[in-house]
Amino acid sequence: MATITTLASSVPLFRPYSFPGGSSRKPKKDNLSIKPPATSSLKVNAKLASADDTSSNFNKDNWLASADELSRSFPPGFLFGGGSASYQYEGAVKEGGRTPSIWDTFAHEFPDKIADGSNGDVAVDFYHRYKDDVKLMKKIGVNGFRFSISWTRILPSGKLCGGVNKEGVAFYNSLINELLANGIEPFVTIFHWDLPQGLENEYDGFLSGQIVNDYRDYAEVCFQEFGDRVKFWTTLNEPWTFCYNGYVNGSFAPGRCSTCTAGNSGTEPYLVAHNLLLSHAAVAQLYKNKYQASQKGQIGIVLVCFWMVPYSDCPYDCEAAQRALDFMLGWFLHPLTYGDYPESMRHLVGERLPQFTEMQAMMMKGSIDFLGLNYYTSIYAANNESPNPHDISYTTDSRVNLFQKRDGILIGPATGTPAFCFCPEGIRDLLVYTKEKYNNPIIYITECGLAEANINTVDQGVKDVERVEFYYEHLKFLRSAIKKGVNVKGFFTWSLLDDWEWNSGFNVRFGIVYIDHEDGLKRYLKYSALWFKKLFGK
């Protein structure tokens, strides 16, 4: 992930966003049917700790030294890795038997929706350069690499009946073997938004329940071909982002929304999310029943959430922050933990929110061995006291307004992605909240990163001291969360390489390795990569 679009009442996540409302406003009493809580566990600024080891000692003039402070902070076996995704990295979209995904179609048919008009046809050419990139990983010292499998490289028709593509299987087998030979654990995502265009054409993809069987068939091929070596599987990457940007505002593939050429922002996001959850449950059940005992791996899911800070200490704003968490994280994690959607969603969305059968709820509940959690920023959440009754949309259903500013002051320093302010304490607060709300799951931070914009030269790009500071601060607050009992087992940077960032194109850079688009996509280690190298003792 790693970009955002437009934010309205409930958060969106990935791709540059414009935020609703002004920078300041006084909360008013809600005239809706929801009653405010007498007390709330969500306090303004959500400062869960002060007398811990999170004070900043970062020195920009001696940035490398800060790695020493954290070098022995994490337990043995802790995974440190870099993240990637197939469409953002691989390129070679017409090679090796691969067929188009919805992102190929979207980027080519709607170049105006991509900031620089680019696409992922070449991306960073990982398909041809993966062996050299694995050498870079080993040089940096990471012991994990998160990547996704391209559905249409494995099943070009999207369906098992259309045949398995041996070239695609061979590519991922070679990548996995290369990683393991270099002491790097593969951490594999089965679906990272690149749905086969053929399935979108046939039955509208995840809008149809037919997707569950096709997705399960695809996942089973992955288990059969790669499961003897892959010990960490995630079924879905950020289903919230897929639903919000794909079906609420139309900024991502497949580009559907109420004001788009097709779509309904008040119904389709909920239907797509429901089918994503059912697909996850079917695949998790398949893996646990048929493959886990012999392959000895684990299966989870990757979710994303901002930390929601109440706009004021008014009880209505505290409750709004809780609703915002429900509508972003709880939308998916609540069914996976408790078998149903959060009560706030059931109350506010009503009959537009699909229901699980008793059997589906049983399949869903407890279906993850671990949770992948992506964190980028925090945001203020305020009660929306006067929702437009004619605007029926996911963005208004939560009755929350989100703000980056309070009294004209940003919640944290600005970054290269307008939607993401620098709020490192939020990673601790979100982790502690997840522990307490959702039964203390095993957690891997599967994405966390800083975007930089307007970086066009190697010399400028490699000197990313701000990114070093970003990771230093976030890892300190992550360490604090671990000391508070959160069961965190790993941390993956977003991203390993500067990549193609969805609707931001190549305009922003998240990598710890610089990609020179002016000189044949040459790779250069940034200061942040050298910092991690020292952190790992390499």
From Swiss-Prot:
E.C. designation(s): 3.2.1.161
Enzyme class of the recorded protein, top EC level: hydrolase
Keywords: Chloroplast, Disulfide bond, Glycosidase, Hydrolase, Plastid, Transit peptide
Transit peptide: 1-66
Region: Disordered, residue numbers: 18-37
One GO biological process term: carbohydrate metabolic process
Temperature behavior of the protein's activity: Optimum temperature is 40 degrees Celsius. Stable below 50 degrees Celsius.
Active-site residues, Swiss-Prot/TrEMBL: E238, E447
Disulfide pairings: C257-C260
Catalysis: reaction(s): 7-[beta-D-apiofuranosyl-(1->6)-beta-D-glucopyranosyloxy]isoflavonoid + H2O = a 7-hydroxyisoflavonoid + beta-D-apiofuranosyl-(1->6)-D-glucose
Residues binding a beta-D-glucoside: Q88, H192, N237, E238, Y376, E447, W494, E501, W502, F510
GO function terms (MF aspect): beta-apiosyl-beta-glucosidase activity
Domain of life from the UniProt record: Eukaryota
Expression sites (tissue/organ): Expressed in young and mature leaves, but not in fruit and stem.
Pfam families for the chain: Glyco_hydro_1 (PF00232)
Subcellular location: Plastid, Chloroplast
pH dependence per the entry: Optimum pH is 5.0. Active between pH 4.0 and 10.0.
Cellular-component GO terms for this entry: chloroplast
Role according to the record: Disaccharide-specific acuminosidase, hydrolyzes the beta-glycosidic bond between p-allylphenol and acuminose with retention of anomeric configuration. Has highest activity towards furcatin, and lower activity towards beta-primeverosides and beta-vicianoside. Has very low activity towards beta-gentobiosides.
Similarity field: Belongs to the glycosyl hydrolase 1 family.
Official protein name in the record: Furcatin hydrolase
Native source species: Viburnum furcatum
